[in-house]
Amino acid sequence: TQKTRIFIIEEKAQNQKASYNEDSFAMLNDVLDWCETYQVYAVVDFHAATAGQSGIPCDDGVDNGQHLYDDEESMERMFLLMEEFMRRYKDRWIIGAYDCINEPISMTPRREELTPKLVYFYEEMIRRCRKIDQKHLFLLNGTQFSSLTYFFDHEFDPEYHNWGISLHAYEMVVPEVASLASVLRTCREQKICLWMGETGGRNEHAWQTTMYEILAEYHAGYNLWCWKTVEGAGCASILNFNVPDEWHLITDYAINGAAKPSYEHAQAIWDSYLECLAVDKCKENTQYHPYLLREGNFEIPAIGYNALPMDSHRGLSDLPNAAGYRLYDRFELVYEKGYHPEPAGFAAPGPIKHPRDHVQL
C-alpha cells in the first residue's frame, strides 16, 4: 500500500515538475525483490492520493476532505507520480496490477457531484500511463467505500482493455451473491475482471470462508487486509503483537484528550512499540490460516452451499425463507435450535440485526 507523500516531495513539485523520495522507492524495490524471490505477485495499492480522495481519515487528506477532485495542481501531481511508477516498473513482471485509488468519495454529501470528476481522473490516468506502460493491469475502485460501480459503464482503457474493478467487503456485508450482484453484472457487461481489493477484518471465520467460496465460484481474486488495527474487535491478522505496557497513555491522549505524555516519555513508548513488531515477538494466528488459504482442515458453513441445484443442497420451496437470506435460490432453510428469525414486515422495534446473524443459520 502506497501513500503518495511517501514517494513525492510535494513542496518541490511545482510547474509540472516533481521531486521524488528515492529512499521510499528503494524500500518498495526491496519488497518487489522479495516478491520475485518467493514468486508472490505484488498488487501496488495507491491507498492515498494527493490532497485526499475519500473523505476518510485514513487517506490523510487535509480536514478529511476530497480535495483531489477540486484542486488541479493536486490531481496533476497524482498523474506525475503515476507516470513515474510506470517509468520505473513498466518491465517489472512481478507487479500483477495497480489498485487505484482507495475508497474514493466515500464520506461526503457531494458524491453525485464529484463522481464525474473521478471518472475523468481514471480515464486521464490510464491514458497518460499507457503512453509509458502498455502491460500492467489497472484495478479501479468504486465510490462509497469501493461499493458503487454503476459509473463503470464504458471502456476505461480503450486501447488495451486491461482493467478491472477493485471491490471492498468486510463482515458488515451479507455473505451472499446478491451482495455482489451489481458489480458482477458490471464486470460481465464490460468483460473485465473483479478483484476483492480489501477483505478480512475481524476473525469471523464463518463469514470469511462463505464469502471466499462465493468469490472463487465467480473467479474473483481477493486480497486479505492482513493488518487492520492494533487492538480490539478488528484486530485480525496472520501475525499479532503485544503493545507496550504504557501504550494506553498514547491512545488516551490521542482519543480521549487525557494528559499528554512528555516528548521523552512518548518517544520511549514508541521505541518500545517498534521493538514489539519484531517477528520473533509476534504471535502467529495458525487457526486463521486454513480459512484464508483454502487448505487443510476447515469448515464451510451450511449457508455457504453451492448454488447449483441438487449439487450441495436439496429442498426447494415455493415460499421464501423468513431470514431473507439467498431468496433467489428458493431454498428451504432449517435453523439451529433456538434461532427464530423475525418475520419480514413484522420485525420487533429496535436495532437492525447485524448481517453476521446469518452465520447462525
Language model features with spans:
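Extracytoplasmic
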Residues: V279-L361
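Residue-level recognition of beta-strand->loop/alpha-helix junctions
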Residues: F7, D45-F46, E198, C226
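Extended, alpha-helix-rich binding/interface surfaces that flank or overlap catalytic cores
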Residues: I214, Y218-E299
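Extracellular glycoside hydrolase catalytic/binding regions
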Residues: F79-E83, R87-T229, S237-L249
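Active-site-adjacent substrate/metal-binding segments within catalytic domains
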Residues: T1-D33, T37, Y335-L361
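Short, solvent-exposed loop/turn elements at domain surfaces
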Residues: T4, V173-P175, G232-A233, A307-S317
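Active-site loop signature of alpha/beta-hydrolase-fold enzymes
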Residues: E11, A49, E103
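An active-site-proximal structural segment forming one wall of the substrate-binding cleft
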Residues: T1-K3, Q14-A97, F121-R128
